[in-house]
Swiss-Prot record:
The keyword Nucleus applies. The gene is Stn1. It comes from Mus musculus (Mouse). This is CST complex subunit STN1. Component of the CST complex, composed of TEN1/C17orf106, CTC1/C17orf68 and STN1; in the complex interacts directly with TEN1 and CTC1. Interacts with ACD/TPP1. Interacts with POT1 and POLA1. Its main location: nucleus. Residues 201-305 are annotated as: Winged helix-turn-helix (wHTH) 1. The lineage of its organism: Eukaryota, Metazoa, Chordata, Craniata, Vertebrata. It is found in: Nucleus; Chromosome, Telomere. Disulfide bonds: none annotated. CDD domains: hOBFC1_like. Residues 306-378 are annotated as: Winged helix-turn-helix (wHTH) 2. One of its GO terms (biological process) is telomere capping.
């Protein structure tokens, strides 16, 4: 079975601080049964804050999903103990025995008729047959989903669900072997970091940001600047004269081409800064925070929440159309309103900007949402 990339986990774990439990729910892996290799389950670092929770590449993990061959079986009064091997390691799985309905209802005092006795007997025989055919022995393939725990200083899985895998031609095992490397690449080997520290890390690592990272950081700083100065409109050139923003946009950036890192030289700093400003403003436009009535980087930008003229025009469009028979009952759909804005105002307005204006008008009780993406004004 293919091996996961364990080097990243081994190198990153010692230097990374444990993420506070408050943020664990932000990682989808925390609530899922993580499909991990047994070797990784055995090597995961246990949380110091919440025993019973483990970390792989920063991902908090409580429950796992494994599939492998049974190499040992121990039967106890209330549970089975299976040693499961997936070709990367062996782990013990505690699987509780299923309660038999026949045993719980076979009390002669409860069974009053011969017919009930006969049905109970037949049911018991059926259950015995099923148990015989599904009995798990050495060499069988088993799938186990459960929580990871420590018992006598050894890590094991306490099963919530377990069953014998009927896979004579290896279809399920091959599918699993193909699935796990993709999960590792897309999910488990992508480190989960403390959201509270991400912005701080970005600020501390400005010199190592690529163009996309620097653009995202600059867009946040522009947003803060516009809010602080309470600006209603601006030109890109105005922002370029702000020393703090210009200093950030002029930082050296790296571009990844495969494994090569090519740093832009100082001779191109001015052009790169303009490009970063343009991309940052484009990002704010995509979020609906700013807009242009006419497209072009040299055109005036408007702050969406500060543009009273835009709010009034959209309000009047909704109010007028709601008086028409086809919109009187349900109101106007968001896309219909956007189309009216493009036709009547000839403004290059995006859906994201319109959504922010509609939310603002609704907060002010100027319009109401009558259904999903439908709005009415009175």
């Amino acid at each position: 079975m293919p091996q996961p990339c364990l080097l990243m986990e081994c190198e990153s774990s010692p230097r990374e601080e444990e993420i506070p439990p408050l943020f664990w729910g932000l990682d989808p892996v925390f609530l899922a049964f993580a499909k991990l290799y047994i070797k990784d389950i055995l090597e995961m670092k246990e949380s110091q804050q919440v025993p019973g929770t483990y970390f792989y590449n920063g991902h908090p993990i409580r429950r796992v999903d494994i599939m492998g061959a049974v190499i040992s079986v121990k039967e106890r009064e209330t549970f089975y103990s299976y040693g499961v091997d997936d070709a990367t390691g062996v782990i013990n799985c505690v699987c509780w025995k299923k309660l038999s309905n026949a045993e719980s209802s076979s009390d002669p005092a409860i069974l009053s008729t011969a017919r009930e006795l006969s049905m109970t007997s037949q049911l018991k025989k059926l259950q015995e047959t099923i148990e015989q055919k599904t009995r798990i022995g050495i060499g069988d393939i088993i799938r186990v989903r459960g929580s990871v725990r420590m018992f006598r200083e050894e890590r094991e899985i306490c099963a919530n669900i377990y069953y014998k895998v009927d896979d004579p031609v290896w279809n399920m095992q091959i599918a699993r072997m193909l699935e796990l490397p993709k999960l590792y690449q897309k999910v488990y080997d992508q480190p989960f970091r403390n959201p509270a520290l991400q912005e701080e890390e970005a600020l501390n690592n400005k010199d190592n940001l690529d163009l996309a990272g620097l653009t995202s950081l600059l867009s946040e700083k522009i947003k803060e600047f516009l809010q602080e100065k309470k600006m209603q409109s601006f030109y890109q050139q105005e922002l370029e004269t702000v020393e703090s923003l210009q200093s950030l946009a002029s930082r050296p950036v790296t571009h990844s081409t495969g494994s090569d890192q090519v740093e832009l030289k100082d001779s191109g700093t001015s052009g790169v800064a303009q490009r970063v400003f343009k991309n940052a403003l484009q990002l704010l436009q995509e979020k609906g925070l700013v807009f242009q009535r006419d497209s072009g980087s040299d055109k005036l930008y408007y702050v969406t929440t500060k543009d009273k003229d835009l709010q009034q025009k959209i309000y009047h469009i909704i109010k007028e159309d709601c008086q028409k028979p086809n919109h009187m009952e349900k109101g106007c759909h968001l896309l219909h309103i956007l189309n009216c804005v493009h036709l009547n105002l000839r403004w290059d307005l995006s859906k994201a900007v319109l959504q922010r204006v509609l939310e603002l008008l609704e907060d002010q009780s100027d319009i109401v949402s009558t259904a999903d993406h439908y709005y009415a004004a009175f």
